[in-house]
Amino acid sequence: AVLFAAMSFTSCNTDGDSGMNILTLEQQKSFQHAMAAGSYNNMTILYEKKNDANVKNQVDSVPSSCSISMYGDSTMTMYKFPVAALAEHISNKDLAAAIAKEDQRTIKCKYNVMPNSTSEVAYFIACPEAINLNLTYGTDNKSHKVVLYFIPSQMYYGYCSLKEPRQLGFQFALYQIWVDGYQTNFIQNSTNSANTTVGFLFRNAWKK
């Protein structure tokens, strides 16, 4: 689903960007070091949320921040990810109730800089690593191992400006929920019941 297509993202179908055209390891690290030099403290995480009072605004947000590893190891850290916000998109009521009680999480994201990057903007694909939860729920009050898997945007690259003022943003989605080693069919987007993913956008917070 293209939830935030109005943002200034670059299409993944950029002309001339083929699977054979990739950055060398040295080029990749050079871009990553340039990205790490920036400060990304005033960020926000936007996510899909049902809003019956305004059908044109099916989005909510939480403040966040980000740090990018200076070691060129393709990792960035996202703070205050709203795990509990996923509850309304889960069809299993017991699991949803357990998810709703979860605190915000600090999560690692893996990213890879794309070859259409320039000296001013690094374009990249990014995705959070899986979130592992140990939850107790259900009528039998049993403990369950729950894993949340994400997928990067299939339509738009993320971006990071390499000059001040720094701008960074990328899209991703909750893609699968596994419980006790089994893939489930529990994702049911509350804003569109036909959608089996939940969209997120991580970007700079807009000034009011």
What are the functions of these language-model segments?
Residues 66-67:
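Polybasic, proline/glycine-rich intrinsically disordered low-complexity segments
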Residues 42, 77-80, 170-172:
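Short hydrophobic/aromatic-rich beta-strand segments that constitute the beta-sheet cores
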Residues 52-54, 74, 139-144, 181-182, ...:
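Intrinsic-disorder/low-complexity loop/linker signature
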Residues 1-36, 206-208:
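Bacterial Sec-dependent N-terminal signal peptides
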Residues 72-160:
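Predominantly extracellular/secreted and cell-surface proteins with exposed
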Residues 18-23, 150-159, 163-208:
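Edge beta-strand at a domain terminus
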Residues 53-63:
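Acidic, glycine-anchored loop motifs typical of Ca2+
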Residues 32-54:
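Tryptophan-anchored aromatic micro-motifs
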